[in-house]
């Protein structure tokens, strides 16, 4: 089971496992916690479980083409947004509205290779207000198969 790779976090793992087994996946999850506790890693594992060619939507095999592409971050239905520095000399990182709009365009299409499109927004708190407002609509009314 791919969730075996996630250290600790027993309660969140049980919640995710139960949702996958019941086939009742909400359109969004918020992974919150201290830095380096495995939030992004867990999101990747959920993405693999949702798109695995062998065991989806309950688990991932970590061997099929879909799992391997997600692991390498090259799956065409996986989108990962990371905040970028607002300027070369700045320490502040930000997610801008242009990045969110580009993601929204990509999510409008049906999955190309997998079962479902997955967007992982790392450090979502770094969105500027315009980006956050724009993304709110996607959260409230997600496109099909996302």
Where do the language-model regions lie?
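Clamp-loader machinery-focused feature within the broader ASCE/P-loop NTPase space
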Residues: 2-130, 137
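Sensor-1/coupling segment of RecA-like P-loop NTPase cores
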Residues: 127, 142-146
